UniProtKB/Swiss-Prot annotation:
Subunit composition and interactions: Homodimer.
HAMAP family noted in UniProt: 23SrRNA_methyltr_H (MF_00658)
Catalytic activity, reaction form: pseudouridine(1915) in 23S rRNA + S-adenosyl-L-methionine = N(3)-methylpseudouridine(1915) in 23S rRNA + S-adenosyl-L-homocysteine + H(+)
Function, as annotated: Specifically methylates the pseudouridine at position 1915 (m3Psi1915) in 23S rRNA.
InterPro entries in the record: Alpha/beta_knot_MTases, RlmH-like, tRNA_m1G_MTases_N
Protein's name in the database: Ribosomal RNA large subunit methyltransferase H
Molecular function per GO: rRNA (pseudouridine-N3-)-methyltransferase activity
Keyword Transmembrane: no
Taxonomy of the source species: Bacteria, Pseudomonadati, Campylobacterota, Epsilonproteobacteria, Campylobacterales
Keywords: Cytoplasm, Methyltransferase, rRNA processing, S-adenosyl-L-methionine, Transferase
Class of enzymatic activity (EC top level): transferase
EC nos: 2.1.1.177
């Protein structure tokens, strides 16, 4: 199984725990943390929400592989067992985290599923940490590992 996590993010300054969750998950899945950011995105984010969405869409257009899940504040709320079931859907799963303006309405229509990690707005670093922890937890649930009790 391959799990790709795509994020519009300036730097690779994530919490060290993300690397740990990727390492611990490696016995069940090949997980990649893919950050996208370039001068076009930076310029577009300064211009307008619409320009930013176009830049995000362009950065992500070649990343739509496997079962695609977008993170969105209005997405479906799952508990950990339901999230684990999502991980059973495909041999390749791609998660998408939008930039400062979220995912564009057009890009959201290309997703197989939209989920929300919280009703609250989260910083990218925190959202990513929560996502990687839930991926690890979901893989543990599916493997009957005692991490999830």
């Amino acid at each position: 199984m391959q799990i790709l996590v795509h994020c519009i993010q300036k730097k690779d300054d994530d919490f060290d725990n993300i690397k740990e969750y990727i390492k611990m998950s490696s016995k069940w899945a090949d997980i990649k943390d893919i950050n996208k950011f370039n001068s076009q995105i930076a310029k577009a984010q300064s211009a307008s929400k619409e320009q930013a969405h176009k830049a995000y869409d362009l950065a992500y257009e070649h990343c739509l592989n496997g079962y695609c899940i977008g993170l969105d504040e209005k997405g479906y709320h799952l508990d950990s067992v339901e999230f684990a079931d999502l991980l059973k859907n495909s041999s390749q799963i791609s998660f998408f985290i939008g930039g400062a303006y979220g995912l564009s309405p057009q890009f959201k229509t290309k997703m197989n599923r939209l989920i929300s990690l919280s009703k609250m707005t989260l910083a990218h670093k925190i959202a990513k940490l929560m996502l990687f922890e839930q991926i690890f937890r979901g893989l543990c649930i599916n493997a009957n590992h005692p991490y999830h009790k």
